[in-house]
Amino acid sequence: MSSAANHERYMRMAIDLACSEIDRTEGRPFGAVIVNDGKVLGSGANRAILDNDPTAHAEIVAIRDACRKLQSHRLDGSVMYSSCEPCPMCLSAMYWAGIKELYFGCSSQIADHYGFGDRLLHDELCKAPESRQVKSVQLLEQEAVRAFEAWVKAGGTADSVTDWK
């Protein structure tokens, strides 16, 4: 099977997951599949309403599924197939997980047309914290930095999206 055919196969899996949610009143029409070396590592459909969890978007559910199965917080080199262009939260999670490629079906503009707009989030992320609609105030920085100092003293090493390659 050609590479293009494989991409289409996995995308159809994501679309099928999105369509499977239509019959459930709690579901939303989003699905995602994570693949590495031709193996499906995880998959998920949007469960935000069903689980009372606003972070349970299809991509996040798929990342959680794959990480749980692999017993790892990293999915380095994996590919995400999503029925729709991911929102900023889901895209950020992909970076944190080490996912290297994304294929998506509908654009965010199409999602917006059907009432699932996330333009506000894109716009808000470009603003300084004090200019955002969610009030953001930095407080007790010197005390808060102690957690990082303790982490370093304990020999901890951190993941950083700045290390993403």
Cite the ranges covered by each PLM segment.
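Short beta-strand scaffold segments in enzyme catalytic cores
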Residues: 30-38
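Glycine/small-residue-rich phosphate/adenosyl-binding loop
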Residues: 42, 59-68
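Immediate flanking context of iron-sulfur cluster ligation sites
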Residues: 72-84
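Local cysteine-cluster metal-coordination motifs and their immediate loop/turn environment
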Residues: 82-101
